[in-house]
């Protein structure tokens, strides 16, 4: 097929991030300069974000058989770029204290965000697999970036081995789907399923294996075992990327797959996904109750959040509202996670060994960093789904979608899970206002709010509050992303 100027405009975010990768590589080869490479990375990601406006002007189109650029792709590309931008911003002060090579960090984040953009635009199982690998491979290096720390290296090895196993399940599942349907395009799969092929054992086995592979990447129960250890072992800025960009991109492509190929029409698939969602919500919240490490706590909480999102995915066939619910929920989850992990990154910067991730490190934070404590409180309330925060709007949407689709047992799980979650989120929030320990541990810099990372954290908190009270701009944006399907 012929690539026209319109196609190139539609691919602008992908091309800009790809070009930034090349520029940063050449810059590292020419001269190692931490500030220069960080600046180039941030400029590239910002340029890719701005280019989305031009992509919108070009309209929806199939660029290649592998990729479709439309409003849906633009929304998820934007969320991935925001998460990547925040990761680079949080990483800069952290890397200032890091004595080994600093510049490769940005290179790995850029390559991973390239994978995220590919996933957001994927319209074919081959693009889905390439995107997942492109986002996973740089994460092996990023998780083990503080390789002199035993925990970081252990987390990287654990993630690498389990990720390879999950990828093999995913690939074998795709092979079975191809053997039965003869096509890997989402639209062609939809036609095959529409022809009554959905109940073929080979096709169901293929989708079952794909659910195993994707369940690992999204850290859903029972494929979640890596999550708390990897979140704890990875440097704080990397945990930010893991919790946001990789989850959002992969969930976005799963949404598109389910939209084109109505796999959820199969009762067997719906029951399996329902059990996974139920187990993820309950188990994730119960395990977070006893955590004293804030990164492990956020790791378990991310399992439950993906469980909530799965409820909206199961309800996808019952109306467009579930697409809206996922868009709003993911935006709320993104800003809340960026704020929470941003505070951990600020407290852990510059690099001085293990991160400040013990709950004890945050005890009495209000008495010497009141604004930072207030930001962390807002993020905890949003993740808990308290009214007047963006997290509440997302959770309300998920409940509404569950009720609309008559998924009563999953609605009950969401309510019970939210009640359990309230306890451990408030436990973190309350500890910020207790008496500070006699010997204070790690602390954020006194001028943290003037740093780039501090500004990102403050903007996240502001968005969580403003969009929690007045969500209409976000809802309108998400609705704009839907008709172009």
UniProtKB/Swiss-Prot annotation:
Keywords on record: Cell inner membrane, Cell membrane, Membrane, NAD, Quinone, Translocase, Transmembrane, Transmembrane helix, Transport, Ubiquinone
InterPro entries hit by this protein: NADH-Q_OxRdtase_suN/2, ND/Mrp_TM
Membrane topology label: Multi-pass membrane protein
One of the GO BP terms on file: ATP synthesis coupled electron transport
One term of GO molecular function: NADH dehydrogenase (ubiquinone) activity
Enzyme class, first EC level, given as a word: translocase
GO cellular component: plasma membrane
NCBIfam families, per database record: NDH_I_N (TIGR01770), PRK05777.1-1 (NF004439)
Name used for this protein in its record: NADH-quinone oxidoreductase subunit N
Lineage of source species: Bacteria, Pseudomonadati, Pseudomonadota, Gammaproteobacteria, Enterobacterales
The encoding gene: nuoN
């Amino acid at each position: 097929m012929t690539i026209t100027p319109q196609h190139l405009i539609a691919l602008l975010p992908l091309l800009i991030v790809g070009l930034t990768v090349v520029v940063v590589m050449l810059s590292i080869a020419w001269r190692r300069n931490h500030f220069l490479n960080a600046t180039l990375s941030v400029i590239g990601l910002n340029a890719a974000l701005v280019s989305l406006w031009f992509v919108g002007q070009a309209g929806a189109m199939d660029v290649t058989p592998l990729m479709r650029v439309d409003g849906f792709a633009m929304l998820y590309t934007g969320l991935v770029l925001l998460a990547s931008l925040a990761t680079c911003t949080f990483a800069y002060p952290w890397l200032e204290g890091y004595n080994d090579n600093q510049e490769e960090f940005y290179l790995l984040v850029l390559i991973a965000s390239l994978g995220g953009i590919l996933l957001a635009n994927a319209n074919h199982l081959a693009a889905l697999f390439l995107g997942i690998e492109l986002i996973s491979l740089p994460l092996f290096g990023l998780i083990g970036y503080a390789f002199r720390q035993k925990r970081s290296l252990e987390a990287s090895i654990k993630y690498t081995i389990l990720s390879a196993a999950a990828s093999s399940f995913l690939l074998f599942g795709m092979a079975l789907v191809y053997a039965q349907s003869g096509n890997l395009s989402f639209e062609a799969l939809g036609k095959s399923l529409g022809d009554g092929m959905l109940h073929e054992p080979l096709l169901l086995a293929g989708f079952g294996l794909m659910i195993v592979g994707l369940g690992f990447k999204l850290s859903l129960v029972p494929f979640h075992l890596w999550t708390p250890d990897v979140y704890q072992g990875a440097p704080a800025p990397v945990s930010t990327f893991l919790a946001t960009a990789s989850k959002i991109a992969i969930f976005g492509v799963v949404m598109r797959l389910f939209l084109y190929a109505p796999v959820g029409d199969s009762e067997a698939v719906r029951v399996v996904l329902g059990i996974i969602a139920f187990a993820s919500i309950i188990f994730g919240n119960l395990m977070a109750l006893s955590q004293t490490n804030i990164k492990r706590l956020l790791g378990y909480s991310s399992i439950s959040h993906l469980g909530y999102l799965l409820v909206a995915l199961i309800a996808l066939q019952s109306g467009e509202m579930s697409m809206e619910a996922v868009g709003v929920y993911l935006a709320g989850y993104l800003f809340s996670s960026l704020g929470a992990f941003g505070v951990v990154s600020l407290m852990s910067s510059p690099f001085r060994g293990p991160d400040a991730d013990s709950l004890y490190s945050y005890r009495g934070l209000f008495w010497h960093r009141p604004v930072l404590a207030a930001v962390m409180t807002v993020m905890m309330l949003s993740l808990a789904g308290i009214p007047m925060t963006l997290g509440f709007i997302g959770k309300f949407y998920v409940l509404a979608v569950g009720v609309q689709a008559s998924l009563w047992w999953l609605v009950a799980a969401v309510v019970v899970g939210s009640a359990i979650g309230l306890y451990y989120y408030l436990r973190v929030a309350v500890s910020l206002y207790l008496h500070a320990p006699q010997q204070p541990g790690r602390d954020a810099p006194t001028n943290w709010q003037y740093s780039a990372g501090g500004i990102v954290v403050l903007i996240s908190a502001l968005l969580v509050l403003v969009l929690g009270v007045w969500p209409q701009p976000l809802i309108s944006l998400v609705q704009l992303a839907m008709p172009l399907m």
